[in-house]
């Protein structure tokens, strides 16, 4: 494993397993981990639903019911309108991002060392420190925002909102520029917020691992405990902002 200096060590842990060049570069580790964790989420919820009983629920059933009720109640309070897609979408976003973030608690050297022993030089197990992953999530939300804008306002209403709000027809070019910037800023902020928080947390774990072992325990343990709060919080923020953006997009035009 590359690690002759502290800089080499840090760069090694922040480098993806990639194939291809330029625009067609694929981060294989991010794809493997994100799809694997997505499949794990689907399997756990399928298993919980399959084992659901009317009697005393199992631990997995309790967890699934708790998550579904929590997300459903949150979306009902936040999303103004009716849509059968919002609650399942919010549940998927929260659980998927939570599982991806949870990989940050895996010991920093464990998986890279195992992969290096297997002949793989680089392997990052935390997908949310890859901008490609966070932007893929936020761009998907962006397209949903556009779709819900057309659904809620119609093509004419959406165009009118872009062109004539907030300053009326006399400032049409300014309105258009302002609204386009606001629209594009939503997926960018969603992506960078998640990436920035998780990247900073991962970097701190890497820096702690460079210290003597007795200092690692003294600093790493409280940071890991604090990070247990950050992991679900970032997933919740991404979910909530998605629901809020879709609710705003779905609002009917007021006359």
From Swiss-Prot:
GO terms for cellular component: plasma membrane; proton-transporting ATP synthase complex. It comes from the Bacteria. One of its GO terms (molecular function) is proton-transporting ATP synthase activity, rotational mechanism. PROSITE patterns: ATPASE_A. It is found in: Cell inner membrane. GO terms for biological process: proton motive force-driven plasma membrane ATP synthesis. Pfam families: ATP-synt_A. F-type ATPases have 2 components, CF(1) - the catalytic core - and CF(0) - the membrane proton channel. CF(1) has five subunits: alpha(3), beta(3), gamma(1), delta(1), epsilon(1). CF(0) has three main subunits: a(1), b(2) and c(9-12). The alpha and beta chains form an alternating ring which encloses part of the gamma chain. CF(1) is attached to CF(0) by a central stalk formed by the gamma and epsilon chains, while a peripheral stalk is formed by the delta and b chains. HAMAP family: ATP_synth_a_bact. This is ATP synthase subunit a. It comes from Alkalilimnicola ehrlichii (strain ATCC BAA-1101 / DSM 17681 / MLHE-1). The lineage of its organism: Bacteria, Pseudomonadati, Pseudomonadota, Gammaproteobacteria, Chromatiales.
